[in-house]
UniProtKB/Swiss-Prot annotation:
Belongs to the immunoglobulin-binding protein SpA family. The gene is spa. Interacts with host TNFRSF1A; this interaction leads to the stimulation of both surface expression and shedding of TNFRSF1A. A motif (LPXTG sorting signal) lies at residues 416-420. InterPro entries: Ig/albumin-bd_sf (IPR009063), LPXTG_anchor (IPR019931), LysM_dom (IPR018392), LysM_dom_sf (IPR036779), Octapeptide (IPR005038), Protein_A_Ig-bd (IPR003132), YSIRK_signal_dom (IPR005877). Plays a role in the inhibition of the host innate and adaptive immune responses. Possesses five immunoglobulin-binding domains that capture both the fragment crystallizable region (Fc region) and the Fab region (part of Ig that identifies antigen) of immunoglobulins. In turn, Staphylococcus aureus is protected from phagocytic killing via inhibition of Ig Fc region. In addition, the host elicited B-cell response is prevented due to a decrease of antibody-secreting cell proliferation that enter the bone marrow, thereby decreasing long-term antibody production. Immunoglobulin-binding region D repeats lie at residues 93-153. It comes from Staphylococcus aureus (strain Mu50 / ATCC 700699). This is Immunoglobulin G-binding protein A.
Length: 450
């Protein structure tokens, strides 16, 4: 029995050993294939992660996978090394910013400096730029719209008066940038002073306006015209007064007064002009008008008027002697002696007898025309004056004189000397002489009878 049991035990041991050996043999023959097909969970995870690491190149990825295959027990270590290398090769955020295209960079900078975006809005737009740089222009446009819509409205704080002042000051052309900004800041600081600030701005704008030569006021224009026609100013003086008018039109009256004073001071003296007039006008007038009158009127009157001819002498004498005497001695004397004397003495050469007038200081064309019985336009036309007010002392003007009616009658009388109508006094004298002769004949006849 004992032997039988021992045999059985031995037989069982051999069987177990055989089975074990077979198992070992079988296991040793299929190990590489089983390892490749049946990775444990750690190996599988490591394999999957290494395949999806974006920053590994192909050689690096294949090397890590081969290491996992070679020694699955080192899967955790291999995976750790792969992750480190992947992280070290990952692109930095700053580097990405530096690689933005030009539009993206510009948009990024502008959005960062938009004052009316809050932090969340700004970060949202920047993230959109990072996600899709090709949309930089659109993202920037949206950011600008939002920034403008959230800007504080300046007009909401201005009242109507302030708004008007603000607008007017902005459009004042003669203020410089600093002045304009100063007034606008004052408007913002105190809107209640809008009217006063606007008034000050207007004054400053007007004071700095360029002076326009063609915008003379009426007073300035008058002074300008008169100074141009002052005959005794030289060119330099005239230009000086005109420049003063341009510089300050408000003192036009004072400038004109100074110009007139200087013009009068430089006028030619009248002493030289009066002497010929006195000699020509007064002395000849007295000699021609008084002496001949006395001789012609009084002597024949005395001879004729006592005995025979009271009737003939007095009546005709009064009519013929006095009236003609007055006409001949006084009127012609005044005309020939006094008027020409005044004209020759006071206004030198107003008329020299040949229809020529010599201009004296103070003369105007209108005055000359009135004195000579013509018109200013006629004088201007005859002398080809461009401006009838532009005449100078000493200038000779042709005057087409129209004589008064009494002169015309005198001329007619002078044109008929044969009839005795030239001078009524001559007719009276002849008549008186005949009367005397007749009286003398009668007187002689009576004496003979006696």
């Amino acid at each position: 029995m004992k032997k039988k049991n021992i045999y059985s035990i031995r037989k069982l041991g051999v069987g177990i050993a055989s089975v074990t050996l077979g198992t070992l043999l079988i296991s040793g023959g299929v190990t590489p294939a089983a390892n490749a097909a049946q990775h444990d969970e750690a190996q599988q995870n490591a394999f999957y992660q290494v395949l999806n690491m974006p920053n590994l190149n192909a050689d690096q990825r294949n090397g890590f996978i081969q290491s996992l295959k070679d020694d699955p027990s080192q899967s955790a270590n291999v995976l750790g090394e792969a992750q480190k290398l992947n992280d070290s090769q990952a692109p930095k955020a700053d580097a990405q910013q530096n690689n933005f295209n030009k539009d993206q960079q510009s948009a990024f900078y502008e959005i960062l400096n938009m004052p009316n975006l809050n932090e969340a809005q700004r970060n949202g737009f920047i993230q959109s730029l990072k996600d899709d740089p090709s949309q930089s222009t659109n993202v920037l446009g949206e950011a600008k719209k939002l920034n403008e819509s959230q800007a504080p409205k300046a007009d909401n704080n201005f009242n109507k008066e302030q708004q008007n002042a603000f607008y007017e000051i902005l459009n004042m052309p003669n203020l410089n940038e600093e002045q304009r900004n100063g007034f606008i800041q004052s408007l913002k600081d105190d809107p209640s002073q809008s009217a006063n600030l606007l008034s000050e701005a207007k004054k400053l704008n007007e004071s700095q306006a360029p002076k326009a030569d063609n915008k003379f006021n009426k007073e300035q224009q008058n002074a300008f015209y008169e100074i141009l026609h002052l005959p005794n100013l030289n060119e330099e003086q005239r230009n000086g007064f005109i420049q003063s008018l341009k510089d300050d039109p408000s003192v036009s009256k004072e400038i004109l007064a100074e110009a007139k004073k200087l013009n009068d001071a430089q006028a030619p003296k009248e002493e030289d002009n009066k002497k010929p007039g006195k000699e020509d006008g007064n002395k000849p007038g007295k000699e021609d008008g008084n002496k001949p009158g006395k001789e012609d009127n009084k002597k024949p009157g005395k001879e004729d008027g006592n005995k025979p001819g009271k009737e003939d002498n007095n009546k005709p004498g009064k009519e013929d002697g006095n009236k003609p005497g007055k006409e001949d001695n006084n009127k012609p004397g005044k005309e020939d002696g006094n008027k020409p004397g005044k004209e020759d003495g006071n206004k030198p050469g107003k008329e020299d007898g040949n229809g020529v007038h010599v201009v004296k200081p103070g003369d105007t064309v209108n005055d000359i025309a009135k004195a000579n019985g013509t018109t200013a336009d006629k004088i201007a036309a005859d002398n080809k004056l461009a401006d009838k007010n532009m005449i100078k002392p000493g200038q000779e003007l042709v005057v087409d004189k129209k004589q008064p009616a009494n002169h015309a009658d005198a001329n007619k009388a002078q044109a008929l000397p044969e009839t005795g109508e030239e001078n009524p006094f001559i007719g009276t004298t002849v008549f008186g002489g005949l009367s005397l002769a007749l009286g003398a004949a009668l007187l002689a006849g009576r004496r003979r009878e006696l």
